[in-house]
């Protein structure tokens, strides 16, 4: 069984939340609402996970790493997960195989479970996400 860094899951899954520049423009600024910081860090990953760029941008990787440093406790991870799940409902166009590539391409050691809009955030435990691989 593989284990998953929830911080990396949070970062990558949050990138799924926005599918157009109009949606990005309406995303909360850092500090606005519970998802503002998550959104701020992962917005640069959108083009890569949609297949519009061949590699994640430097800002995608730096945001991913920064968020993984900030989301530490089980409760923080669960709250970030809830934000992501709410934001991803009804979103299409995300390529899950590219989502799984972001940690590797950004130098973050992790694997990712399937990411869906009905993901059960209560499964998140401490520093490890278990049971999906």
From Swiss-Prot:
GO biological process: lipid transport
Keyword set, alphabetical order: Allergen, Disulfide bond, Lipid-binding, Signal, Transport
InterPro entries in the cross-refs: Bifun_inhib/LTP/seed_sf (IPR036312), Bifunc_inhib/LTP/seed_store (IPR016140), Plant_nsLTP (IPR000528)
Entry protein name: Probable non-specific lipid-transfer protein 2
Stated role: Plant non-specific lipid-transfer proteins transfer phospholipids as well as galactolipids across membranes. May play a role in wax or cutin deposition in the cell walls of expanding epidermal cells and certain secretory tissues.
Superkingdom, natural source: Eukaryota
Keyword Transport: yes
Pfam family, one: Tryp_alpha_amyl
Signal peptide feature range: 1-31
Record bears the keyword tRNA processing: no
Disulfide partners: 35-83, 45-60, 61-106, 81-121
Family: Belongs to the plant LTP family.
MF-aspect GO terms: lipid binding
């Amino acid at each position: 069984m593989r284990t998953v860094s929830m911080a990396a899951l949070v970062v990558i899954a949050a990138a799924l939340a926005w599918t157009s520049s109009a949606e990005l423009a309406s995303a909360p600024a850092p500090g606005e609402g519970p998802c503002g910081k998550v959104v701020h860090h992962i917005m640069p990953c959108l083009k890569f996970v949609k297949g519009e760029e061949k590699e994640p941008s430097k800002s995608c990787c730096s945001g991913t790493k920064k968020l993984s440093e900030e989301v530490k406790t089980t409760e923080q991870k669960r709250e970030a997960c809830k934000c992501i799940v709410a934001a991803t409902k009804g979103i299409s166009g995300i390529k899950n195989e590219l989502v799984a590539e972001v940690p590797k391409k950004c130098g973050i050691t992790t694997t990712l479970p399937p990411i869906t809009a009905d993901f059960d955030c209560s499964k998140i435990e401490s520093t490890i996400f278990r049971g999906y691989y």
